[in-house]
């Protein structure tokens, strides 16, 4: 499971997600990708479940890149504990995702295989996503 090796502070405030992604919103490695359409938190287990679903479907062919990393700790107090007495202990890690962020990329497979693999990954995630395809810049020879 993905998580940071070490962090400066064990606990973080929740924060809020404003605006669209300004970085990581284009395909950089693969031919096809999965782009977030709404904001949210994606846990390390959800990322791993999506990765397993994709890699099992594409079998030996192709390569998968995970473009997000869960670096935010989420704390939880034990069940049936009275209010107060401090913040709970870190339970799991999440990646904060803004709309427009590319979550996964795939290369080395056909478009149909990539579409199906990313569709399987979509169902493992708590946010709406869309399929992305690398657009080749068509060269019109305009020499003026």
UniProtKB/Swiss-Prot annotation:
Keywords: Ribonucleoprotein, Ribosomal protein, RNA-binding, rRNA-binding, tRNA-binding. GO terms for cellular component: cytosolic large ribosomal subunit. Pfam families: Ribosomal_L16. One of its GO terms (biological process) is translation. GO terms for molecular function: rRNA binding; structural constituent of ribosome; tRNA binding. Disulfide bonds: none annotated. Part of the 50S ribosomal subunit. Belongs to the universal ribosomal protein uL16 family. Binds 23S rRNA and is also seen to make contacts with the A and possibly P site tRNAs. This is Large ribosomal subunit protein uL16. It comes from Thermoanaerobacter sp. (strain X514).
């Amino acid at each position: 499971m993905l998580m940071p090796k070490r962090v400066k502070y064990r606990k973080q405030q929740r924060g809020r997600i404003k605006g669209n992604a300004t970085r990581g919103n284009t395909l950089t490695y693969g031919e096809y990708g999965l782009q977030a359409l709404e904001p949210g938190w994606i846990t390390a287990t959800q990322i791993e479940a999506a990765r397993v679903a994709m890699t099992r479907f594409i079998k030996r062919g192709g390569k998968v890149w995970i473009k997000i990393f869960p670096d935010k700790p989420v704390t939880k107090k034990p069940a049936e504990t009275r209010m107060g007495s401090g913040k709970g202990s870190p339970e799991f890690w999440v990646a904060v995702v803004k709309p427009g962020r590319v979550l996964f990329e795939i290369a080395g497979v056909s478009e149909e295989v990539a579409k199906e693999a990313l569709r399987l990954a979509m169902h493992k995630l708590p946010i709406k996503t869309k399929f992305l395809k690398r657009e080749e810049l068509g060269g019109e020879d305009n020499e003026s």
